[in-house]
From Swiss-Prot:
Residues 558-626 bind DNA. CDD domains: PH1_SSRP1-like, PH2_SSRP1-like. It comes from the Eukaryota. Residues 513-524, 536-546 have a biased composition (Basic and acidic residues). The lineage of its organism: Eukaryota, Viridiplantae, Streptophyta, Embryophyta, Tracheophyta. Belongs to the SSRP1 family. The keyword Transport does not apply. Residues 476-487 have a biased composition (Acidic residues). It is found in: Nucleus; Chromosome. One of its GO terms (biological process) is DNA repair. This is FACT complex subunit SSRP1-B.
Length: 640
């Protein structure tokens, strides 16, 4: 939006706490998006009824009222932003903002103003506070002069706040002139009736529709799902969640492939909380072929006035369709269904693994969704690039019948979807290419010699893994050939060293220094005549090679010099582990190798200098060690 203004760190006010995000004002309206993804608010210019400025502690607040009766509060603006934004709105949007003042005197008497779904308490001409009537769960009179408002207490709003507003009481004298009454209908009752007309009250007594015994995978359990006018409730044996519809971002209806179940996912912002665990997605599993009939407990007047063209009196059909239609009508949330993608078995998803969990990866029109656990939604706009890889966890070579898909986000977060079947490759590659997402190894993915496609098309499970070879070339090898051969020959040991491994073992797997080419050639030529085939009829399989006994290492020998990459690894391993605690040791080693390869010569120079000092130390200790060994040989006969 080049014709407008763009601000970072602008917060959206509400009962859910202060959510920072990006604010954009342009000639066609305004937009706000939560930082890190999530809730998005867009208001067209034609829907705006009024705009107000207010000075609040440490910043300025921009208030926006809409034709639907909604009121948005954005704060975090500076004093110098007021004039520029005011001029822009007057010139390009034909809107003149009104300045309001905040009452800070501490008076608890004043007047009440109801504008749309907002209730403001004013002291004179200044505003003391305001509340949204959409957050009111119940309102009732106490005596003849008091009106009490009770607010929703759900499991989403205020999740990060220590305190939350529970109730609010107004005393309305019988002599009040703002809400005039009489002997039979006092002023407090007039105010109560005005609030009652704007708030969704009474909805907590009776649910509009109920679905019993529903299997929910996240948070796991069987729940009775009640849909009310302004919120839904999940009642289980051990848990009870209450969620306002304003917290629902979107609904997903995703059938399983070759399975009699369908996922219905409710995406929330803010998420619900269970202990210290946050659940941004509620994953419900319905039986695909189950048919139900439900009547809504709504009067014809309410349906006609509030839910016209959104709800019907009764529904009959597949249970997941009935549930999603009623929830969409009550909450106003949009529904996302499978995209044009089809797997090799004509399904909507491909089988894969994320972390330690098996599940389904759904390629959607605007993102990817992995279900059921952990439910992970990745939007296309958040993706930096994708990369096709043919290797298992930590780079271990596996069968060419599978490949991995790495998704790198713009915030440097990565998601690795493992063990996708080879026959899904072309459909997935064509879909990603059609969405114009950046493919990092595009040349390899398109079938270049030695690339992913070439390897996947090979039926030889022992084919060379180009990604694994690239990692090996990056990390180098500073150990002797004898130990390398023993390591490779052990088929059961295919992992990388752990954090507790010795430094010499780590050098063999992770070092990126120079190779001792001449010594390796000599060792290779000397070992060639020693390789013999196992005679037929032996215990091992035909063609197997007898393992050579490992040469005993002198404990007094000097420790080999550490390569520059190892110094870099030691310096960055802890930081990488702290920022990505879910990564396995082998994955950390891989990421360190990738970072090292992308570094410039200047960035590598400090580690190169450390390695050169260590090489000098190794050369000196080696010379002293060889001299001591020669003395031992010379003195050997005398000792005999």
């Amino acid at each position: 939006m080049t014709d407008g203004h763009h601000f970072n760190n602008i917060s959206l006010g509400g009962r859910g706490g202060n959510n920072p995000g990006q604010f954009k004002l342009y000639s066609g309206g305004l937009a706000w998006k939560r930082q890190g993804g999530g809730k998005t608010i867009e208001v067209e210019k034609s829907d705006i009824t009024s705009v107000t400025w207010m000075a609040i502690p440490r910043s300025y607040q921009l208030g926006v009222s809409t034709k639907e009766g909604l009121f948005y509060r954005f704060f975090g603006f500076r004093e110098q932003d007021i004039s520029s934004l005011t001029n822009f709105m007057e010139k390009n949007m034909r809107i003149t903002p009104e300045e309001k003042q905040l009452s800070v005197g501490g008076h608890n008497w004043g007047g009440i103003e109801i504008n749309g779904n907002m209730l403001s308490f004013n002291v004179g001409s200044k505003e003391a506070f305001e509340v949204s009537l959409a957050d009111v769960a119940q309102t009732q009179m106490q005596g003849k002069t008091d009106v009490v408002l009770e607010f929703h207490v759900d499991d989403t709003t205020g999740g990060n706040e220590k305190d939350s507003l529970m109730d609010l009481s107004f005393h309305v004298p019988t002599s009040n002139t703002q809400f005039p009454g009489d002997e039979n209908r006092p002023s407090a009752q007039v105010l109560w009736q005005a609030i009652l007309n704007k708030a969704d009250v009474g909805s907590s007594e009776e649910a509009v529709v109920t679905f019993d015994g529903i299997a929910i995978l996240t948070p796991r359990g069987r729940y009775s799902v009640e849909l009310h006018l302004s919120f839904l409730r999940l009642q289980g044996q051990a848990n009870d969640f209450k969620i306002q519809y304003s917290s629902i971002l979107r609904l997903f209806v995703l059938p399983k492939s070759n399975n009699p179940h369908t996922f219905v996912v409710i995406t929330l912002d803010p998420p619900i909380r269970k202990g210290q665990t946050l659940y941004p997605h509620i994953v419900i599993q319905f039986e695909t072929e189950a048919v139900v009939q439900r009547d809504l407990t709504l009067s014809d007047e309410v349906l006609a006035e509030k839910y016209k063209d959104r709800l019907e009196n009764s529904y009959q059909g597949l249970i997941h369709e009935v549930f999603s239609k009623v929830l969409r009508g009550l909450s106003g949330a949009k529904v996302t269904r499978p995209s044009t993608f089809r797997s090799c078995q004509d399904g909507y998803a491909v089988k894969s693994s994320l972390k330690a969990e098996d599940g389904l990866l759904y390629p959607l029109e605007k993102g990817f969704f992995f279900l059921p656990k952990p439910p992970t939604l990745i939007l296309h706009e958040e993706i930096e690039y994708v990369e096709f890889e043919r290797h298992g966890a930590g780079g271990a070579s596996i069968s060419s019948h599978y490949f991995d898909l790495l998704v790198k986000l713009k915030n440097d977060q990565e998601h690795l979807f493992r063990n996708i079947q080879r026959n899904e490759y072309h459909n997935l590659f064509n879909f990603i290419s059609g969405k114009h997402l950046k493919i990092l190894n595009l040349g390899e993915a398109q079938g270049r010699a030695g690339g992913v496609t070439a390897v996947l098309q090979s039926t030889d499970d022992d084919a060379v893994d180009p990604h694994l070879e690239r990692i090996r070339n990056q990390t180098g090898d500073d150990e002797s050939d004898e130990e390398d051969e023993d390591f490779v020959a052990d088929k059961d040991d295919s992992g990388s060293p752990t954090d507790d491994s010795g430094e010499e073992g780590s050098d063999a797997s992770l070092s990126g220094g120079e190779k001792e080419k001449s010594s390796k050639k000599e060792a290779s030529s000397s070992k060639a005549p020693l390789k013999k085939r196992k005679p037929k009829g032996g215990d091992a399989a035909e063609g197997s090679e007898k393992r050579k006994p490992k040469k005993k290492k002198d404990p007094n020998a000097p420790k080999r010099a550490i390569a520059p990459f190892m110094y870099f690894s030691k310096a960055e391993r802890a930081n990488l582990k702290n920022s990505n605690p879910e990564l396995a040791t082998t994955e950390i080693a891989k990421k360190l190798g990738e970072r090292w390869q992308k570094m410039t010569a200047e960035e590598k120079q400090p580690y190169v200098e450390q390695s050169q000092v260590d090489k000098k130390r190794y050369a000196e200790e080696s010379a002293a060690y060889r001299g001591a060994a020669a003395m031992d040989v010379d003195s050997g006969p005398a000792s005999d």
